[in-house]
C-alpha cells in the first residue's frame, strides 16, 4: 500500500483538483519525514503504521498550511515510535 493524493482528498473531502500539486508535495515530504525519523535503510512501506503516519501528517500540513506548525501531531509521533519498535 501507498498513500496517494486521491486518498488524502477522499479523507479530507476535497473535490477540486487545484490543490493536487500542493497535496502531492506535502505527501512526498511526509513520506521523507517519516522514513527519516524511523530509519533511512528499512523499507517501511510494508507496515500499515507507515501509511497511517504519512496520511495523518499530510492531512495535518494541508489543513494547517497558513499557521505556524511547530509540533508534529501526537498520532504521527506515536506511529513513528511503533515503527521504530517494529524494526529494532
Give names to the regions the model predicted.
Residues 1-88:
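Divalent metal-cofactor coordination and adjacent catalytic microenvironments
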Amino acid at each position: 500500500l501507498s498513500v496517494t493524493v486521491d486518498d488524502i482528498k477522499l479523507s479530507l473531502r476535497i473535490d477540486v483538483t487545484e490543490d493536487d500539486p500542493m497535496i502531492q508535495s506535502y505527501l512526498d515530504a511526509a513520506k521523507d519525514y517519516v522514513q527519516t525519523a524511523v530509519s533511512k535503510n528499512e523499507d517501511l512501506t510494508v507496515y500499515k503504521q507507515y501509511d497511517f503516519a504519512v496520511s495523518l501528517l499530510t492531512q495535518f500540513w494541508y489543513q494547517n498550511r497558513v499557521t505556524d506548525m511547530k509540533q508534529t501531531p501526537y498520532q504521527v509521533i506515536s506511529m513513528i515510535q511503533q515503527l521504530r519498535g517494529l524494526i529494532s
